[in-house]
Regions:
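Outer-membrane beta-barrel translocator/receptor signature
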Residues: 199, 211, 222-225, 236-311, ...
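Membrane-embedded beta-barrel scaffold of Gram-negative outer-membrane proteins
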Residues: 375-381, 385-403, 553, 560-561, ...
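Conserved C-terminal beta-signal and adjacent last beta-strands/turns
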Residues: 448, 656, 685-785
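Structural signature of Gram-negative outer-membrane beta-barrels, strongest in the C-terminal barrel
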Residues: 316-320, 426, 444-449, 453-457, ...
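Periplasm-facing N-terminal accessory domains of Gram-negative outer-membrane beta-barrel systems
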Residues: 2-8, 13, 17-120
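Gram-negative outer-membrane beta-barrel transporters
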Residues: 513, 613-615, 633-721, 744, ...
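Periplasmic plug
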Residues: 129, 152-155, 160, 166-172, ...
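Face-selective signature of the C-terminal outer-membrane beta-barrel domain
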Residues: 370-395, 417-531, 657
């Protein structure tokens, strides 16, 4: 392992030095920035600063409120507009080979009030359609011109809604629902598929750390710049898995000016958060940033407190005008006292036991996640841009707990069972390199990117070995304390996954309006599993995945698109794969999608619409052959749906954001083994997938005060494959009010589940369920210095 790390580091250094010696290219792209106030009037004499990792350009708007930049590299840039008497405004934009235009609307306020994609800003960028689509492609194109559904959730929007953890923030994307999975690992459902099976992948700054059980641990939103949700089969970006979506958590980066961000929050159940972020420019070429946060939550069920501590540090160095180097380290430590559900008494929620925790008093659920990377971006001669990322991640997790509760009518007692004991020790190292260039063929631009990824994922697992029945019976209303039986950890297995990946993407501008966009990914990953009880087993997989689509620009601000995409997914997440599962092939999934993305009515209305269908094949199903019950990969699952989101600004101070998703997810072919026989579930709905998810948020601004409310509706779901046990639909109401003062300070009061709705978001059991949190409030104070 040490040898592998040394080779990767040597490769990174060699590439960086070679590029530094050769780098001397410049770009030829053009960007036009139009600055207005919220009424649409042009703003002259505004300072416009355009920054990218290795360069900075400045200009001043003319009498028409326009600033122009030429000789730029294509790709993501940050536009910052400063004007006395207005709030300083920042926007991310994707500069393309063709002339690019972007509008920035300023709001009255002090210069020190810096706004990044403010939720109550004009609708022209509320959905960030002009931002670089980094979460959906490696090409330098904006979200508007990506033939797929990509939702960008900004830090500003997260703060406006008072959201503390990253998993909850993903519900700001249309149709996404979340839940607490086994081991209190956050779970996510998208387009009829769940992270439980590995069908939703988590990335950190564009790199997939591991399967969701590792990378999906709790994460404080204070550390993030944004969240990017790419829906549908996303193996092109995330590799195996990602049938339903890939989610990219993007951390904050060092800035070119001295800045400090602070956060203080306190709320129900003695929940508090503290956050401090400082960005320091040592010179014009060297800057560093550190963010520290601590969150503590007492929990709405007794003895279910949790604690999350995070430290993120980063350094950016620009040794030459054509070379950018970045390094970052992330340390997180979360300790959760999990809530595994409330027993249903006579098949109903009995409010007398709603807040009782039946788990053992000394249970343990703790994880330490560390992540580091070194990035280099070099501008080479003839317009080539070379990027390299060397990364490593570690995880240590320990579980000791009971995971089920059940009311026994005959005795009137509650059975506490499913004693679980596990430990993990993971190490992931890898390197990714890619090259980008815009070619000109027959006077038409062709954008290309190609690259190679190599990584090694080494996972050790311990269990409790053979443990006798540890079930306990307790009084449902006054349970006596239960303690850990004290079984030692026993080493169980090592799973080693070596991956080699080649990928490429391209965009061809057939005409000024019509563009074809596509990409392909070829992988070879070798899975070696060495288990104490079953011995050594090995299996290699070589899937090919990708996406191809077309985008037609009706106008520069209205696009139509269609696409086909393909992903693959193992029958069992690789982190927990068994020797028997290794003999099964990967499960392919295919999606067709069509839709539109538009900004109309002078930027007062922004909308996206998508119609999609996904088929996942070769899922495991039970059949009887010659009287013998066996598992075969002949099953199929499908989902069909429509998603619509809109942001409207009828007046400069009033914004309405809404989205609705209608979904039908069902089994086309699936047989379930019930022990006594095999039963077909063909035509049944897939459990836990709501038929409708709806959100609407009106927001009103009165001077420095902003007030908003959100109504969220989640439709009914089935709890089981037989579609016999129904989870009732639920509607929640939340609201927030914030006031800005002292230039850069904001005080926000947030209330959640204001109607005190009693509901179960998800349950795999017909005898218990995790009841959602009751009504709660918190107060948050943020300041930017």
């Amino acid at each position: 392992m040490i040898g592998v790390i040394r080779v990767l580091i040597a490769f990174f250094i060699a590439v960086s030095y070679a590029a530094a010696a050769a780098a001397q290219g410049s770009g030829s792209a053009q960007l036009t920035v139009t600055v207005t106030d919220t009424s649409g009037a042009r703003v002259p004499d505004a300072a416009v600063i355009l920054t990218r990792s290795n360069s900075e350009h400045t200009a001043t708007t003319n009498a028409d409120g326009i600033a122009m930049f030429q000789g730029l590299l294509t790709g993501p840039w940050t536009v910052e507009v400063v004007k006395e008497g207005f709030q300083t405004r920042q926007r991310r934009v994707a500069v393309q080979s063709a002339p690019t235009s972007v509008s920035v609307a300023l709001e009255v306020g002090g210069v020190a009030e810096r706004v990044l994609v403010q939720a109550a800003a004009p609708a022209e960028d509320a959905l960030q359609l002009d931002a670089a689509a980094t979460g959906g492609t490696r090409l330098d194109i904006p979200v508007r011109e990506l033939p797929a559904t990509l939702t960008v959730i900004s830090q500003e929007l997260i703060q406006e809604r008072g959201i503390n953890n990253a998993t909850d923030a993903t519900e700001l994307a249309p149709g996404v629902t979340t839940f607490a999975d086994s081991g209190s690992i956050p779970g996510i459902n998208v387009r009829g598929f769940s992270s439980t099976s590995g069908a939703v992948s988590i990335l950190r700054d564009g790199i997939r750390q591991n399967t969701v059980p590792q990378s999906g641990r709790p994460l404080d939103t204070f550390m993030l710049d944004r969240i990017e949700v790419l829906k549908g089969p996303a193996s092109l970006m995330a590799g195996e898995g990602a049938t339903g979506a890939s989610i990219n958590y993007v951390t904050k980066e060092p800035r070119r000016e001295l800045q400090a961000d602070t956060l203080l929050s306190y709320g129900s159940w003695d929940k508090y958060r503290i956050g401090l972020g400082v960005s320091v420019p040592f010179t014009s070429k060297l800057a560093a940033r550190i963010d520290v946060s601590h969150a503590d939550n007492g929990g709405y069920v007794e003895r279910t407190s949790d604690r999350l501590q995070s430290v993120v540090g980063g350094v950016r160095w620009l040794p030459t005008s054509s070379l950018s180097l970045k390094g970052s380290l992330v340390f997180t430590n979360d300790r959760v006292h999990p809530y595994y559900g409330t027993p249903l008494i006579n098949n109903e929620v009995d409010e007398r036991v709603r807040f009782i925790n039946y788990n053992m008093r000394d249970e343990r659920n703790e994880a330490k996640n560390n992540y580091g990377r070194l990035d280099a971006e070099m501008v080479l001669p003839h317009g080539w841009v070379l990027s390299n990322s060397l990364f490593a991640a570690t995880q240590d997790v320990e579980w000791r707990e009971y995971e089920s509760v059940q009311y026994i009518p005959a005795s009137g007692l509650v059975q506490v069972g499913s004693y679980f004991l596990a430990k993990r020790d993971d190490l992931l190292v890898g390197n990714q390199i890619d090259a980008r260039k815009t070619l000109t063929v027959f006077s038409r631009p062709i954008d290309v990117v190609t690259g190679y990824l190599v990584q090694r994922n080494d996972q050790d697992r311990w269990t409790g070995g053979t443990i006798p029945n540890q079930n306990r019976l307790v009084d449902p209303f006054n349970p006596e304390p239960i303690f850990d039986p004290g079984f030692p950890f026993v080493f169980d297995r090592n799973v080693l996954v070596n991956t080699h990946t080649f990928f490429g993407e391209g965009r061809v501008g057939v005409t000024e309006r019509l563009k074809f966009v596509g990409g392909v990914r070829w992988e070879h990953f070798q899975v070696d599993r060495d288990q104490v009880s079953t011995g050594f087993a090995s299996q290699a997989y070589t899937p090919t995945t990708g996406r191809v689509g077309a985008v037609y620009m009706l106008t520069p601000l209205v696009s139509l698109y269609t696409s086909l995409s393909r992903a693959v997914e193992p029958t069992t997440p690789l982190v927990s794969i068994t020797a028997a599962s290794m003999s099964f092939s990967l499960q392919p999934s295919r999606q067709w999608e069509g839709g539109t993305k538009a900004t109309i009515f002078g930027g007062r209305l922004e909308t996206t619409f998508a119609l999609f269908g996904i088929n996942k094949e070769d899922i495991l199903t039970n059949t009887i052959v010659d009287g013998v019950r066996i598992q075969q990969q002949i099953g199929e699952q499908m989902s069909r749906g429509v998603e619509w989101s809109v942001t409207a600004t009828p007046t400069p101070s009033f914004v309405v954001m809404a989205d609705v998703t209608a979904l039908n997810a069902e089994y086309v072919e699936f047989n379930e083994n019930l022990g006594a026989g095999v039963v077909s579930r063909a035509g049944n709905d897939v459990p836990h997938m709501p038929g409708v998810v709806f959100n609407i948020t009106p927001m009103q601004r009165i001077g420095p005060v902003s007030v908003s409310a959100t109504v969220r509706k989640v439709g009914e779901r089935w709890r089981d494959n037989a579609n016999l046990i129904r989870l009732e639909p639920y509607t929640t109401v939340s609201a927030s009010a914030s006031v800005r003062f002292l230039r850069g300070t904001r005080l926000t009061v947030t209330g959640r589940n204001l109607t005190d709705e009693i509901y179960i978001p998800r349950s795999n059991s017909d005898v218990s369920g995790r009841i959602a949190a009751p009504r709660s409030f918190d107060v948050q104070l943020t300041r930017i210095f």
